[in-house]
Amino acid sequence: MGQDYTPTWSFLTNHAQVLICIAHDPGVRLREIGETVGITERAAHRIVGELAAAGYIWRRRNGRRNHYTIQSHLPLPDPLAREQKIGDLLAILAGEQRSETER
């Protein structure tokens, strides 16, 4: 593996990448999420639905658009990182600043 090697895989799941998109823009459109993550709009819709069903995001209609709120106080669903919170991950990956009440 030389310096020109570009992996075809990612450390971050599509779910994590969708959360990062929402953290950057809570009013982001599913089409924009798909374009940014490199998935179809339908896949973005499915992932947002899964995140909402699991309680990691709240979806609220705002006119013709959705507005998302990330529940940053919830633990990560991964067995090796259950002591960490969603907000901890986003603070690192999305540069999110959290208030003391979210910690």
Question: Where in the sequence are the language-model features?
Answer:
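Amphipathic alpha-helical dimerization/coiled-coil segments
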Residues: 1-3, 75-103
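Short, cationic-aromatic polyanion-contact patches
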Residues: 4-15, 29, 61-84
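Pre-recognition alpha-helix immediately N-terminal to the DNA-recognition helix
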Residues: 16-21
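Alpha-helical residues within the helix-turn-helix
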Residues: 35, 52-53
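Key DNA-contact positions within bacterial/archaeal DNA-binding proteins
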Residues: 42
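Short, hydrophobic-biased segments on the C-terminal half of alpha helices
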Residues: 48-49
